[in-house]
């Protein structure tokens, strides 16, 4: 069967840059699934994406589906005919479904009986006939949150469509896709190359688009070119470009023919905190800031034009003129804000609502102030500095700078606090209170910052759960999942002596009578323990290890972490599987018994050597391991408990637990309970698979 290259290109108006990659990848994944479902043999499916096009190129696509043999088994012969040998209704209905009569059916005979059988040779459908619907279906499944409709058409897509190219080898596949008749016309760059041209063969793509249309259709190629050229441009001015992955992706999605240029701004603007300047350059203008080798911002930026100009200096000057007013605004806001102290913004917080049932930002500030001080006392941080940081924590939200450049919240609080002469750990805490902002982000760097960050997040968790607005499905408007994980990370990775129980109770207490959920404390703790599950799964821990620890519901995050590491290590021991099985057996025996057990094992009642030996070792280990448990040395404790494998195995091999003698039975059950309690001091080992 011959093979050909297939090309589909959808020419559109400018596509959303932040969604371009996902649209192209989904298009490729959807179409690959369509090919596979249809049984069409094919080679690599390569996707292309530029601001005004989505395209796929499929190598070695078979020209038709393979022929196939189909078999459909019908009713058993006994049910297919009546006593007179006439076909039953079931047989006739089956035959109609197969497009035959009963007398045309074959018979299938096996050692289990005889059935009617329909067998047919089905010729594979041509690829040309299948492709239009496959393309349309793949486009319909794209993850587009908001569709557009244009003109008088009822067609909906992410952006208006102007061209549809469908080529199988050198042949146009006739189809109407998204209201457009397919042909071999492709549009080039808006301002360079040929605005429109025809493509003779699918194999010519994307080279013909580069040569004649001045468009680099390969997304990764554009991105790599921007990165390499920007790094070289920064090197030429003695700096390093801030090429964040997200901005690189966005810029690569905005240009069809990237040309990297370098511009500058006035050095006087460097007196403004660099974060505000960078926010303007990256967020508003999509420029790449440039830093010196010592990490200081340089008065330069790198940007990407979408055209090769005979006079690039004109483009550079234009971009410098565009960015200057934004930097001047930042300078003005910075100087204006510093004319009063950060603390002077406190009264204005009373005018901003945090949440209708939970009060204003000033109310939240008061709670954070008290909670940060309480946390500081628990972890040995400076209480006065923590309460001061809590008082100032939201004041920068009322400044001109943060109002205009919202992503500078926190960092501007730090700069203004330093200007006011606040303690350095207080100033740093104002910036770091929102950390970690995302997975893998840095944690607060000092104890005061840790106290403030935990207080801010716990206040939100307690308040939102307290009014019954916990996350549902994918909806999490208050980012409670991120807040919970942030609290856990800070406590675990900083090894802080905090208990979720008392921490949540204190956060709830500070709300007074505002909360309506009577179970708020348990709900918050359960939610946070659930985030532990997700965290440790991401870290590579097995689900049953997590469940074994969760079963004990330890509410000290650092303690939870120690148990996780202990159980994970325990699983590597030779005795682990046998002891997990023994714990499961003990758990089942105890669960089935409704007898009242003794407080201790009666040594005089023990009879068999195996139970005497096991009872002695349980007593010895109970006394020996008490300080281990008190100090959180769970790994050492489980290593010691692993020594019980041999006496436990011997006990179950030689000793009957559920004997008729009640005193003996209860004594043995009591011993098993004491054995299980030792393991439960760490985790429920019986849950390990």
Curated annotation (Swiss-Prot):
Protein name as annotated: Glycine--tRNA ligase beta subunit
PROSITE patterns: AA_TRNA_LIGASE_II_GLYAB (PS50861)
Domain of life: Bacteria
Gene (name only): glyS
One GO cellular component term: cytosol
Reactions this protein catalyses: tRNA(Gly) + glycine + ATP = glycyl-tRNA(Gly) + AMP + diphosphate
Species lineage: Bacteria, Pseudomonadati, Pseudomonadota, Gammaproteobacteria, Enterobacterales
Similarity comment: Belongs to the class-II aminoacyl-tRNA synthetase family.
Record organism: Escherichia coli O6:H1 (strain CFT073 / ATCC 700928 / UPEC)
Record's subcellular location: Cytoplasm
Subunit and partners: Tetramer of two alpha and two beta subunits.
Keywords, comma-separated and alphabetical: Aminoacyl-tRNA synthetase, ATP-binding, Cytoplasm, Ligase, Nucleotide-binding, Protein biosynthesis
Any one GO molecular function term: arginine-tRNA ligase activity
The enzyme's E.C. designation: 6.1.1.14
